[in-house]
């Protein structure tokens, strides 16, 4: 019955409001960046839109481990599992710190969103090009030096089945090379809202678990510590999930 009520609300009210807010938010970001308010634009319009989007989709968020959130002036490479497109709203709306996303190159071409991300100077990476990876490292360094943290999904893409996929090494190389700690975060429940290859969202509660920061230096010497840190991070992030399942580490 609750799902029926949700769809009776969603199509005439929730979905139109979501699309309108998308256009308003991305347009605001683009204009504000053009006028020189890039730091404000890269954070606050997306924060408000993310909170609104979760509310419009009847998907409340419970936060565990808020005491691990960075204090003012601290920068991190923030890593999280990638359950669905709603992960963006969860992190943007509930992890309140200055940051830049590291995004797949394909997202640059999304209507409205791609242009807004470009204007906000988010970092696009194409794993197939060595030059793109090198550019990502340089942009990451500039981002951290400017006082912004970096958000990365180390799986590289959304999960196909709800399990945590094997982590790629890019986030951990970046953390090591730039000498910043990693902040692991677990998202649980977003997969139930919108699994990959589906387009009709379902309301569901989300739990956001913020873990204690870790460092690549905790796991030995370079380069062996990169693979070890990736495996240990995957274990940390997977632990709070309800079925506690992961793909092969």
Residue ranges and their predicted role:
Residues 67-71, 200-201:
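A short beta-turn/loop motif at secondary-structure boundaries
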Residues 63, 78, 101-102, 208-210:
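Generic preference for hydrophobic
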Residues 57-64, 133-134, 190-192:
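Short gly/ser/thr-rich secondary-structure transition/capping motifs
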Residues 4, 134-249:
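Non-catalytic C-terminal accessory region of glycerolipid acyltransferases
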Residues 70-73, 144-146:
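Glycine-rich phosphate-binding loop signature in dinucleotide/nucleotide-binding domains
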Residues 1-33, 44, 69, 227-249:
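Membrane-interfacial terminal anchoring regions of lipid-handling membrane enzymes
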Residues 22-47, 55-58, 71-130:
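Catalytic core of membrane glycerolipid acyltransferases/transacylases, capturing the structured
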């Amino acid at each position: 019955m609750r799902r029926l009520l949700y769809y009776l609300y969603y199509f005439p009210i929730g979905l139109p409001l979501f699309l309108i807010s998308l256009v308003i938010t991305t347009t605001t970001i683009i204009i504000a960046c053009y006028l020189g308010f890039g730091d404000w634009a890269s954070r606050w319009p997306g924060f408000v839109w993310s909170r609104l989007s979760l509310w419009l989709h009847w998907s409340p968020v419970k936060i565990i481990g808020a005491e691990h959130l960075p204090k003012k002036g601290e920068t991190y490479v923030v890593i999280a599992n990638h359950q669905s497109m709603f992960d963006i709203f969860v992190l943007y709306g509930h992890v309140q710190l200055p940051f830049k996303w590291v995004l797949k190159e394909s997202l640059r071409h999304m209507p409205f969103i791609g242009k807004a991300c470009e204007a906000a100077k988010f970092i696009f990476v194409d794993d197939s090009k060595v030059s793109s990876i090198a550019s990502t490292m340089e942009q990451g360094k500039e981002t951290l030096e400017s006082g912004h943290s970096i958000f990365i999904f180390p799986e590289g893409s959304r999960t196909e089945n709800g399990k945590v996929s094997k982590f790629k090494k890019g986030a951990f190389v970046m953390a090591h090379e730039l000498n910043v700690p990693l902040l692991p975060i677990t998202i649980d429940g977003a997969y139930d809202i919108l699994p990959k290859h589906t387009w009709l969202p379902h309301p569901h509660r989300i739990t956001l678990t913020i873990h204690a920061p870790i460092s690549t230096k905790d796991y030995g010497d370079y380069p062996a510590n990169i693979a070890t840190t990736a495996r240990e991070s995957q274990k940390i992030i997977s632990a709070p999930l309800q079925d506690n399942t992961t793909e092969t580490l």
